[in-house]
């Protein structure tokens, strides 16, 4: 039986990803996205979760660190605030932070499993999003209940669909100016394959999702993003435990597309962990590979002359972002 904890060691056996990136081993001078992981608590414990969120996790970002994130966002000229978790709604400062983030004029994205909005204390969240014009990125493993719940667990599909309907009633996914006060309310869905396979063609999958969700549930949305599962965290452990790591990695490496390298998300963003530690992306957070400079968001908040441009830390889970048409 393989040691399922040694995912990083297993990944290191493959051809080094960093050799593939050439001149793109640095970030851009001007970063556009500040991605903030505000906590690892979640009402789900999905099989593919790279950050290993679950109801048992207690890590959460403090208000002080959130305030530092807002300061860095303004000082460094970011244009997008991307809030993730866990289920980010479970952070006690979430609503306050959403209001503060929206007040900056940024494009504010929240990532959600949506079903959290049917749990006690979170029922008002969809109305908050609509009021503030928040962009909602919702994960939906499949439009077929049985397939979706194979990845997420029993009882997860119906509440997700009900909340999606609520969002549509509020004006989400209906095009420009359909929301309150003429806002454009964007609802995007995120699809991850359930096993050791690459995602299907994104355009074809989006057409299929739009047709099925509209016909069966009366749901509209804007975009579908097909994301390859990064071979780290809970998914990486499962690959090792089932003997599928080698097969999956060979698929990723075989599908490497050099045209996706310039647009890797790590080149345009800074990712902040719940405790303020800085990473090149959320996947690097999952395998605990911090930025080379070893800084915390507090360092940048206190000293805004620290350069935003940096060397990027690469490892072999990065193949997931550059397979096929890319997942950044």
Residue ranges and their predicted role:
Residues 141-265:
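Radical SAM enzyme [4Fe-4S]-AdoMet core and its adjacent flexible, acidic
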Residues 63-83, 91-192:
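Radical SAM/AdoMet-radical enzyme domain recognition
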Residues 2-85, 89-100, 104-106:
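Conserved alpha-helical substructure of the radical SAM core
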Residues 30, 45, 77, 132-133, ...:
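Short loop/turn motifs at secondary-structure junctions
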Residues 277-328:
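Flexible mid-to-C-terminal extensions adjoining Fe-S/redox cofactors in radical SAM and related proteins
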Residues 42, 46-49, 266, 276, ...:
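Short cysteine clusters
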Residues 22-25, 255-259, 306-309:
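Short, P/G- and charge-enriched loop/turn segments at secondary-structure junctions
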